[in-house]
Amino acid sequence: MWGGCIQFRISVPGAKIICFKGHHMSRMSIRGQGQVTGKRSCHLHPLLRCAKGLLLCRPAAGLRHLQNQQNEPSQDPHQCADSCPALHSDRNHLNKEAEAMEGQNPTCSRHESAYPIQSQVSKSKKQRNYVDGAAVDDLKNLWDRLQTLQQSLTEMPYAEGLKPLKNFTSFEELLSMGGDSLLNDLLDIQDSITQCCIRASKYLNKEGNCTSLNYYKQPFIAAVYGPTGCGKSQLLRNLMSAQLIVPTPETVFFITPQVDMIPPQEIAAWETQICEGNFLAGPENTVVPQSGSIMPRFIQMSYAQLTKDENYDVTSPNNIFANAASKGPIAIVMDECMEDLGGNRGIAKFFHAFPSKLLDRFPKCTGYSVIVVLHNMNPRRDQGGNIANLKIQAKVHMISPKVHPSQLNRFINIYTKGQPTAISLLLKDIFNYHRLNTNFDWIVYNTEPIDNCMHWMYLSPQEGLIPMYLNIQGKLYQALERIHRTLTDRQRWTRYYHSKKK
């Protein structure tokens, strides 16, 4: 079905399906309640395929410490008994804490002396650690991810400048030759990864996909970067129909250089998709609107109308945005306006000052979204500073892998300074892989994610919106460095031993 992109089998009537046809995404609502099973054909980067299974990780277990202890000495018969039976053996006394009568099994004083008569059990200085079954499973889970990461780092084209990391040849060799210190450190890293997955799972659905881009954070300012033909206009409609922006806007303002630039079929597509994004399937064959409006409004505007003085003043009765905000959430979408944005007229107020005034003045306006489409990540013409302000104020950057690699590399170098160099190179390899192997896919960078796993996300027609877990990849790389350091130290001490032996 739909060109072999997605094949669905509906087992019971009553489900909602979000599907893509090529680069087009639409939703089908089926009456009743039931399940949908799907078969997808996707071409994900190997590391992204591995990220889909991160939520299946188990809590990390520690090492079980068993010491070389002597046998417990037999109890001295002259010592007091552990428990002394009271006079009321059936415990029917009103005061359960009543002491026994004098001479009837007197209680013993439990105060420990500073100098006990019996010497403490001697302990061996060296302790042996035994890994229990749960810890072995956690280490095996970590080992599989380390193998995937190391293979991806080795095979990517950017690996020439990376230092090769030593590793054990097999998992069995790691268990037998790793040592207690290394295994403990690896289990700590696995436990940290597990905690990250648990925190992130609260914001994901059962398939491990993100349910929203902003998770009700306001205002929502987004920049979309991509060359002509990469599906930017379709992406904008899909964000509305897939309900990735919450709350759902009741009024969508579509800004273009001229109003007559929009063909009738595109207007119909906008009206259809923002309408279907406003409803969810309800009980008993009903649909439930997600906003206070049954039919969201779609208003076309030119860039000249946007920059009118009356639209900057929230108190003006002619402010079209204020009038719409008094009824509910609004969204402003700017498409094909990069040349106008580079002019002298500044519109930076729409990115920071205007939304705060609008949200404070109108309680019904619970959502304010601005999405700006740019063909170039670094345009030369920006006389009014609009594009520079947009990049600063934007909370979400949606980047097509089709963008020129030099611009992508510059963006990645700026926004991954806290990550290891290997992870930054890996992100560049992910962009390059999807530039060559996929179409209409997007990489999303969130400056203020609800969870650190969602700083970088991947938006695919087949897979939806999935987190890339770059923070977890950084922890995995830390584990690889820990193994490398252990093996390097052993080799150095081995050389030192042989040199002294001669």
Curated annotation (Swiss-Prot):
Region feature DNA-binding, mapped onto this chain: 495-502
| UniProt organism field | Canine adenovirus serotype 1 (strain RI261) (CAdV-1)
Induction (record text): Expressed in the intermediate phase of the viral replicative cycle.
Kindly indicate whether the keyword Hydrolase belongs to this entry. no
MF terms per GO, please? ATP binding; DNA binding
> Binding of ATP: at which residues?
G226, P227, T228, G229, C230, G231, K232, S233
UniProt keyword ATP-binding, yes or no = yes
| Assembly description | Homodimer. Part of a genome packaging complex composed of packaging proteins 1, 2 and 3; this complex specifically binds to the packaging sequence on the left end of viral genomic DNA and performs packaging of the viral genome. Interacts with protein 33K.
Query: What's a single GO BP term from this record?
Result: viral DNA genome packaging via site-specific sequence recognition
Family listed: Belongs to the adenoviridae packaging protein 1 family.
Explain the purpose of this protein.
Answer: Component of the packaging machinery which encapsidates the viral DNA into preformed capsids and transcriptional activator of the viral major late promoter (MLP). Binds, along with packaging proteins 2 and 3, to the specific packaging sequence on the left end of viral genomic DNA and displays ATPase activity thereby providing the power stroke of the packaging machinery. The activity of packaging protein IVa2 is stimulated by protein 33K which acts as a terminase. May be the protein that pumps DNA into the capsid powered by ATP hydrolysis.
Pfam families named among the record's database cross-references = Adeno_IVa2
Q: Which domain of life is it from?
A: Viruses
In this chain, the stretch annotated as Disordered covers 99-122
Main localization of the protein?
Answer: virion
Keywords (alphabetical) are: Activator, ATP-binding, DNA-binding, Host nucleus, Nucleotide-binding, Phosphoprotein, Transcription, Transcription regulation, Viral genome packaging, Viral release from host cell, Virion
Question: What is the recorded name of this protein?
Answer: Packaging protein 1
Q: Which gene is annotated as encoding this protein in its UniProt record? A: IVa2
Compartments it resides in: Virion; Host nucleus, Host nucleoplasm; Host nucleus, Host nucleolus
**Listed GO cellular component terms?**
host cell nucleolus; host cell nucleoplasm; virion component
